[in-house]
């Protein structure tokens, strides 16, 4: 990124009205002063970003710079100033593709073919440049202008990733529920084919106005997707040509290795021989259904925006549901990203195990490195008093733990980790300690513990714990 003293955006661009808003950003119309050209400036408040969000911003800018295609919203400039980062994009004024379709007097299968062709052209360009979008959905399909026949533009590369060739790997759980592929839901390695699955979902909606996979219960929705459980019900599908259904089937193939790719899809007769293969019949039922589909999407978006604005939640905290919680697909148009939650939870379990190992070994030096100097605790040895600092624990390390040469083995049972933002976490678990008593008889102690961790300078430190049950020192 450029140095913080840079004022290039302020010097070269003039800002105008607001076009949209996100959690940490605002989009405003701007004009490049020396040429009078209009653009859209995405203004990100970098003071509010975590280190991980900074990395994501840089990743998005890098990816957008790579992509230059008539069906992709183009990034023209990326400028860092004090407290703000500016991404200068094409100004697209035609609104969402799906909103435009419902305003048309005439809409046919051939029109749907032309729409998906442009989407496939944008996806093909991404894939040829080693980019997987990961969040293809109606909200990210815009029109260049309000003119008839305006180009479809793919937008929002916030979840996009770079891949090497046909590399498949686990890049994290990311996307929007109704458009997620079976391999992502199975937590399998994935790559470019996830975008083709989403294209299949979009094409299905373009033809009948409702999605192939839908359920109020998110768990059941995911089961449908993993099973590839969609069909072409009568009467609405009776008037769709077999070639259109064939392309959908090739896109919604469960096995990603057998799924059609973007280059192949562009060669499909329903796309490249549109005038003779795709039906020209007006599809009023599709338009009517699509109106309802759009209305539901907008309502969900408005509810989420209101919650964010009035309750000051981050989108992330709203969307990371505890395991097993059912979620209605009322939020199925909302992007979710769960890239490394599992890894971060494992990190907390590991550092907790290291702390317990230091206790078992009577290693006060190792213990102090893992604990905050102002560590607070409730523990049986303190008789219900809140203890602060290390002196209380030092006594046990110096007079009991370090002098005990009995073999001790500790097991952590049922650890539950709650991630609290980027740099805090709470873990609750049962601790079983096995040891030999003074008579050499095997004994087991149990305690129930909760520990609060805080990450400072990249290092996790225990700032508070609460223990009930047995004291930790074998007797």
UniProtKB/Swiss-Prot annotation:
Autophosphorylation of CAMK2 plays an important role in the regulation of the kinase activity. Residues 13-271 form the Protein kinase domain. InterPro entries: Ca/CaM-dep_prot_kinase-assoc, Kinase-like_dom_sf, NTF2-like_dom_sf, Prot_kinase_dom, Protein_kinase_ATP_BS, Ser/Thr_kinase_AS. It is an enzyme of class 2 (transferase). Transmembrane segments: none annotated. The keyword Nucleotide-binding applies. One of its GO terms (molecular function) is calcium/calmodulin-dependent protein kinase activity. PANTHER family: SERINE/THREONINE-PROTEIN KINASE (PTHR24347). This is Calcium/calmodulin-dependent protein kinase type II delta chain. It comes from Xenopus laevis (African clawed frog).
């Amino acid at each position: 990124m450029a140095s913080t003293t840079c004022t290039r955006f302020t010097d070269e661009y003039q800002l105008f009205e607001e076009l949209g808003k996100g959690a940490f950003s605002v989009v405003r119309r701007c004009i490049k002063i020396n040429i009078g050209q209009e653009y859209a400036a995405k203004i990100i408040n970098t003071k509010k970003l975590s280190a991980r969000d900074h990395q994501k911003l840089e990743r998005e800018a890098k990816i957008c710079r790579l992509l230059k295609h008539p069906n992709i919203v183009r990034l023209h400039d990326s400028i860092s100033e004090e407290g703000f980062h500016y991404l200068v994009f094409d100004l697209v004024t035609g609104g969402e593709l799906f909103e435009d379709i419902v305003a048309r007097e005439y809409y046919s299968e051939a029109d749907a073919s032309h729409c998906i062709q442009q989407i496939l052209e944008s996806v093909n360009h991404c894939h040829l440049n080693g980019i997987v979008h990961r969040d293809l959905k109606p909200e990210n399909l815009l029109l260049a202008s309000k003119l008839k026949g305006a180009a479809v533009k793919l937008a929002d590369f916030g979840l996009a990733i770079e891949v090497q060739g046909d590399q498949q790997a686990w890049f994290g759980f990311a996307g929007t529920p109704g458009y997620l592929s079976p391999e992502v839901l199975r937590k399998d390695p994935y790559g470019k084919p996830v975008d083709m699955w989403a294209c299949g979902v979009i094409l299905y909606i373009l033809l009948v106005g409702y999605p192939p996979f839908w359920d109020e219960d998110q768990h059941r929705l995911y089961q449908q997707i993993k099973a590839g459980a969609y069909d072409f019900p009568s009467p609405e599908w009776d008037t769709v040509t077999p070639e259109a259904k064939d392309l959908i089937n090739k896109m919604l193939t469960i096995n990603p290795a057998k799924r059609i790719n973007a280059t192949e899809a562009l060669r499909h007769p329903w796309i490249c021989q549109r005038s003779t293969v795709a039906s020209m019949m007006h599809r009023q039922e599709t338009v009517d259904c699509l109106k309802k589909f759009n209305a539901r999407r907008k309502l969900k978006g408005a509810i989420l925006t209101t919650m964010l604005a009035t309750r000051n939640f981050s989108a992330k905290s709203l969307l990371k549901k505890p395991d097993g919680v059912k979620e209605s697909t009322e939020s199925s148009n909302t992007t979710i990203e769960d890239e490394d939650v599992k890894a971060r939870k494992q990190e907390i379990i590991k550092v907790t195990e290291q702390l317990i190992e230091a206790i078992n070994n009577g290693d006060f030096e190792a213990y102090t490195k893992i604990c905050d100097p102002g560590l607070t605790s409730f523990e049986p040895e303190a008789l219900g008093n809140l203890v602060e600092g290390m002196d209380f624990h030092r006594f046990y390390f110096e007079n009991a733990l370090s002098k005990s040469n009995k073999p001790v083995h500790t097991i952590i049972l049922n650890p539950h980790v709650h991630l609290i933002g980027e740099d805090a976490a709470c873990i609750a678990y049962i601790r079983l300690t096995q040891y030999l008593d003074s008579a050499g008889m095997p004994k087991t102690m149990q305690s129930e513990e909760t520990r609060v961790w805080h990450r400072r300078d990249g290092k996790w430190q225990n700032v508070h714990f609460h223990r009930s049950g047995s004291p930790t020192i074998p007797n």
